[in-house]
């Protein structure tokens, strides 16, 4: 019988669930749909979590789950939302086949912890709830927390408004290629890359594609990869878009760093999300400015798997 914990990362695009042993080793992994309560309904959230958890345990029957931690996008610091999500997880775990995997005396109030997704990303990178995490994926947010409980958040307003996000990079790219086409009738190298990805024949088709009902926010945000590729090939417009994104993200990081007291020991900065982990121009600009201008930041860590932070927190709530 393996004694384990469940770590869950419920985002706006997908849900990831991992099963880990007492030493943090991941022995099972599952995935489901989005779990952000601001974007999908309660039944959809339950379905996503149920699918992800079932994928983890179905091939590992000899289990004893000691604790669960879920980092959920859209929950924030709201105790009401956290409690609602805890209830959903308990509804899943308290029915077969899940219930048979829980340790005797499992208490949902004590053994199921729900936090914001920013918290698990911070812990995954820094190893504790002390430091700053900057996340840039479809949306963006910067969050700081100290061991004394001081907490500061900048951004996280939603993908329509978040600066330095994948969606914002994609939106700026679309404006750039449409403006160039209006002024000169030119299909720029960046425009051609977008047309290829979206399988369009002309820049004239771009606006219709953007506003059709089947186009998702992630379709726009994923253009950040195209902008990064174009910038790497020397496209100046793409480079400028990425510089602007880096500047906006750094401003948010700086705002948090200057409002929070990390003491003499300072803190780590954790960089997470597809833009910060995969777009080198953005990351390198931020890293350089942080090292020069923010002495409270003693180290910079990349976080590619926030769910590992959920495992760390679950282990703290377990008897392992």
PLM regions and their residue ranges:
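ATP-binding/phosphotransfer module of carbohydrate and carboxylate kinases, centering on a glycine-rich
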Residues: 1-67, 79, 105, 124-132, ...
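Long C-terminal interaction/binding lobes of large macromolecular proteins
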Residues: 70
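Short loop/turn segments at strand-loop or loop-helix junctions that form parts
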Residues: 73
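Phosphate-binding/catalytic loop of phosphoryl-transfer enzymes
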Residues: 76-187
